[in-house]
């Protein structure tokens, strides 16, 4: 590095950090150091650039921190996968590319918390629009000139997508043309962070490509943040490991922690900010006893409901190695074909009970039967629904195990700890079976492969969930925003009790949102970037949005009644 002092130091070049680096350096008089523990975003590496290759980065450690939980007490004491992105782009470099913002009522609910009144949906919507360029053009809900390239599914990609959406409608649930528009609730096409040329649209591509040549931005990869430095109760810089060297950089204005819901609380704790009793166990000098750091950890858990496909229209042949060179060549030369899609092109959100105020279950439809990380592929034509509950009351924690920055922390999500979790997963399995029984899927639907049609009782379904449910890779809320005793940051991401230090990423969500987390994380960073720059907030939207207000979860009876259990 040519200088050791910057206005801002950003720890983590992921979904949020790249937004901040790009927006802050729009001011030519501001200098920014962006630190990333992983490597560059190689634009010719098919593992991260080809949408259909999304499982590959999760199978190694080049782009994946590959965290693992402690034995989960309610999940047969399994140690469960917790993949997080490592490299420029962070988790936007390895995620499933589903662009889902969450439900409007998620943000309206945040705004009911003391001090978070300006996080209501209509306050957030302008920042979602600012970040986005949608291929079908802008409207009241979508942007047309933002850094994130969003494409929406088009008809005719695979007959299974249209059949699964139609089956949801036949089961009595709404149809929606836009899961990010007026009405999230219902079934419809899925927006994706994929470019019109069929490449992954990570924040490294969308944001950093605009900023990396600016003289006031310095990007250092393979730079592992060790500790935040303090003078009293003010953050003054960061010590990081770069190769064999330990480097210290000073921040004239602020240190911005954007390391994600696992690594952000880990870095704070290692630096002496966190629950005092945890820090003293490791002989870490306590800068500030802040009990919420690492607590309130939330995630989405999901399961795969899989069926045999009677017609040869699934992606099963694409899993065979002898077909993959042709798929890869078409993608590389033309940006088209099976390689150009993440194949999550349809999905939906439903309420399983009439008294649920907004959807509590999410669906991703996939025209093949396989685990998200590419494991356990079914050796036949098949299709599946990824199904999971959205706002589990179960919370966990991230706790430092070592002062060594290379050591992974102790992670416990505490999945399925509450009775509501079990009720919602049973409801989800039964609702999914009813959807899959509808006439739209008659020509495709074969045997139920998982859980298996013979599993019907509550105990049998619970046993399946306990053994087979997996993470949806949505950790969040471990440095939550708010003003209660467990809050870590205020409504602008500033760490309570510390000057010159913010956390800006999914960890500051007070409650997890309804859907995938990449889009909300980008929005959070856009909104706080304006606060850091002391810009006037974008004008509040006046767009309309759907509120159930006690309406039935289904608008009518299913075309085909559920099977008798």
From Swiss-Prot:
Location of the active site: 474
Catalytic activity: choline + A = betaine aldehyde + AH2; betaine aldehyde + NAD(+) + H2O = glycine betaine + NADH + 2 H(+)
Organism domain of life: Bacteria
Pathway: Amine and polyamine biosynthesis; betaine biosynthesis via choline pathway; betaine aldehyde from choline (cytochrome c reductase route): step 1/1
Pfam families given in the database record: GMC_oxred_C, GMC_oxred_N
Enzyme Commission code: 1.1.99.1, 1.2.1.8
Keyword flag Transferase: no
GO CC, one annotated term: membrane
Family matches, as InterPro entries: BetA, FAD/NAD-bd_sf, GMC_OxRdtase, GMC_OxRdtase_N, GMC_OxRtase_C
Gene Ontology molecular functions: betaine-aldehyde dehydrogenase (NAD+) activity; choline dehydrogenase activity; flavin adenine dinucleotide binding
Keyword terms of this UniProt record: FAD, Flavoprotein, NAD, Oxidoreductase
Signal peptide from the UniProt entry: none
Cofactor(s) it depends on: FAD
Binding site for FAD: 7-36
Top-level EC class as recorded in UniProt: oxidoreductase
Gene Ontology process terms (BP): glycine betaine biosynthetic process from choline
Family of this protein: Belongs to the GMC oxidoreductase family.
Cited PANTHER family: CHOLINE DEHYDROGENASE, MITOCHONDRIAL (PTHR11552:SF147), GLUCOSE-METHANOL-CHOLINE GMC OXIDOREDUCTASE (PTHR11552)
Function statement: Involved in the biosynthesis of the osmoprotectant glycine betaine. Catalyzes the oxidation of choline to betaine aldehyde and betaine aldehyde to glycine betaine at the same rate.
Full protein name: Oxygen-dependent choline dehydrogenase
Taxonomic source organism: Burkholderia mallei (strain ATCC 23344)
């Amino acid at each position: 590095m040519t200088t050791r002092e910057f206005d801002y130091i950003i720890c983590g070049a992921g979904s949020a950090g790249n937004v901040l680096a790009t927006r802050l350096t729009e001011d030519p008089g501001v200098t920014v150091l962006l630190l990333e523990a992983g490597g560059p975003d190689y634009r010719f590496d098919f593992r991260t650039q080809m949408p259909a290759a999304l499982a590959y980065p999760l199978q190694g450690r080049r782009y994946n921190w590959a965290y693992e939980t402690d034995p989960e007490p309610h999940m047969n004491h399994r140690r469960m996968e917790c993949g997080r992105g490592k490299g420029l782009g962070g988790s936007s470099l390895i995620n499933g590319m589903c662009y889902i913002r969450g439900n409007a009522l998620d943000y309206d609910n945040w705004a009911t918390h003391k001090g978070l009144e300006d996080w209501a949906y209509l306050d957030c919507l302008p920042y979602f629009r600012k970040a986005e360029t949608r291929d079908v053009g802008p409207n009241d809900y979508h942007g047309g000139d933002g850094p994130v390239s969003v494409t929406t599914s088009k008809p005719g990609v695979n007959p299974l997508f249209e059949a699964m959406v139609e089956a949801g409608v036949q089961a009595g649930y709404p149809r929606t043309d836009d899961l990010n528009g007026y009405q999230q609730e219902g079934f419809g096409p899925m927006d994706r962070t994929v470019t019109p040329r069929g490449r992954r649209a990570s924040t490294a591509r969308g944001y950093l490509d605009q900023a990396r040549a600016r003289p006031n931005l310095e990007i250092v990869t393979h730079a592992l943040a060790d500790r935040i430095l303090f003078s009293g109760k003010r953050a003054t810089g960061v010590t990081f490991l770069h190769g064999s060297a330990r480097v210290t950089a000073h921040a004239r204005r602020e240190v911005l922690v954007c390391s994600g819901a696992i690594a952000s609380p880990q870095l704070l704790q290692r630096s002496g900010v966190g629950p005092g009793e945890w820090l003293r166990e490791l002989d870490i000098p306590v800068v500030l006893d802040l009990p919420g750091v690492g607590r309130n950890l939330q995630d989405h858990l999901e399961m795969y409901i899989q069926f045999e496909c009677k017609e040869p229209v699934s992606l099963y042949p694409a899993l065979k190695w002898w077909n993959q060179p042709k798929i890869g060549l078409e993608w590389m030369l033309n940006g088209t074909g099976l390689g150009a899609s993440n194949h999550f092109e349809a999905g939906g959100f439903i309420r399983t009970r009439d008294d649920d105020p907004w959807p509590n279950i999410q669906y991703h439809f996939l025209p093949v039967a396989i685990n998200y990380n590419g494991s356990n592929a079914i050796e036949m034509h098949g299709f599946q629904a990824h199904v999971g509950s959205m706002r589990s009351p179960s919370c966990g924690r991230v706790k430092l195990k070592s002062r060594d920055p290379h050591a992974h922390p102790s992670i416990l999500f505490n999945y399925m700890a509450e009775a509501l979790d079990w009720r919602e997963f049973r409801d989800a399995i039964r609702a999914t079976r009813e959807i899959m029984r509808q006439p739209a899927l008659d020509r495709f639907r074969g045997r139920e492969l998982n859980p298996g049609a013979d599993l019907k009782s509550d105990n049998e379904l619970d046993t399946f969930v306990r053994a087979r449910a997996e993470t949806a890779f949505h950790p969040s809320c471990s440095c939550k925003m708010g003003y209660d005793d467990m809050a870590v940051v205020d409504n602008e991401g500033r760490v309570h009790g510390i000057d010159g230090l913010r956390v800006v990423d999914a960890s500051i969500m007070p409650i997890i949102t309804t859907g995938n987390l990449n889009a909300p994380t980008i929005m959070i960073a856009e909104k706080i970037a304006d606060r850091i720059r002391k810009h006037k907030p974008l004008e509040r939207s006046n767009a309309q949005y759907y509120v159930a207000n006690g309406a039935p979860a289904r608008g009518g009876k299913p075309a085909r009644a559920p099977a008798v259990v």
